[in-house]
């Protein structure tokens, strides 16, 4: 029963790449590690670093950052 509930939740997952910012690397199979602004499930877009398939229909594990978190990271790199 728990598995079925999780499956329904996953079926409702959606994403929209709002802005492509940077390709960090590309592997031998064409997957790219990118920095983008991505909206997940209709929420406001966040900064997102993760791997993407060549056609951007599949994604790997990644990390999302709010505007504030992204600014903290940028400031840390400047110092």
Identify the role of each PLM range.
Residues 2-79:
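Positively charged, low-complexity terminal tracts
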């Amino acid at each position: 029963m728990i598995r079925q509930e999780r499956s329904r939740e996953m079926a409702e997952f959606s994403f929209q790449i709002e802005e492509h910012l940077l390709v960090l690397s590309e592997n031998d199979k064409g997957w790219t590690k990118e920095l983008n602004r991505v909206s997940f499930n209709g929420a406001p877009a966040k900064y997102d670093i993760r791997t993407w398939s060549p056609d951007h229909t599949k994604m790997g594990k990644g990390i999302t950052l709010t505007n504030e978190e992204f600014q903290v990271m940028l400031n840390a790199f400047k110092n």
